[in-house]
Amino acid sequence: MTVDISGAVGDAAKFGANAFVDAVYTAGENSEMFRAIAVHSMIEARMVKNDELDIVETAQGGTKIKTYKGRAVIVDDSLTVSGAGADRVYTSVLFGGGAIGFGGVEGNAFALGEGVPKVAAEVSRTAEAGNGGGMESIWERRTWMMHPFGFEWVESGAAMAEMSPTLADLRKAAFWNRVVDRKQVPLAFIKSKA
């Protein structure tokens, strides 16, 4: 699922077609399931320097979509970057249809798009509010979740920082268990320099 070329020497550590093809083919015969790649703007700049970025105009005209090897390019500078200066390592993400879903309700993992809070709704009353007339407030709680296809969330053996997972918790491999064959998971990652 992850192709890491960041430790290579010179240009071999930089994003390019070889790393892209290696990442796509971690899915074997399902390599065509990838429809988009999310990259940092520095990786997009590398694509431009390599003259590998194509611009496709939609059938209706007017809208242009950047593509790399037939996959739509999403540029987002909030993607993971580690290191500093020339040693920066950028994580690029390949996505297929259904890679990320909404879910959390047992038996309907991708249907409802929300979890089940401990107390989903309650009413509170403040008698002294409203010039003595009182006020009622309805509290409704929802836990919206995004979940990568093919993985289950496990809490055994690792302690979460809070009741709901934090971003730091979501980054820990100890909380994730892949439950379907790698070739069925529409996600792949490339770690490279720009």
Task: Put a short name on every predicted segment.
Residues 8-15, 22, 48-194:
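Sequence/fold signature of self-assembling virion shell proteins
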